Amino acid sequence: MKRFLLLYNGPPTAPDASHEGWPEWFDRIGGALVDVGSPMVNGFALHGDGTRSDETTILNGFSIVQAEDRDGVLDLIADHPFVLLGSEYTIEVFEVPRK
């Protein structure tokens, strides 16, 4: 099984709205969930010239799942409660190679 990082990207939401449906999704994907992850707040960036910026990519949080391939991940996240919030919410998926 391959591991995939899910990055949640979208406008801020009320905590109740953004977490609705997550327990059911966790139950549905079962052992495919490697790490529930966490919300992400107060980001900043360090640039190559040593300067710091408070402007970053808007990321709401992350999770890690495992699947055979990209199609398997798409099956896992097709009904993810985050994307069901609306078209302005996206999940970016990246394969995380094992060491």
Residues covered by each model-derived region:
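Conserved, structured core segments of small domains
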Residues: 1-99
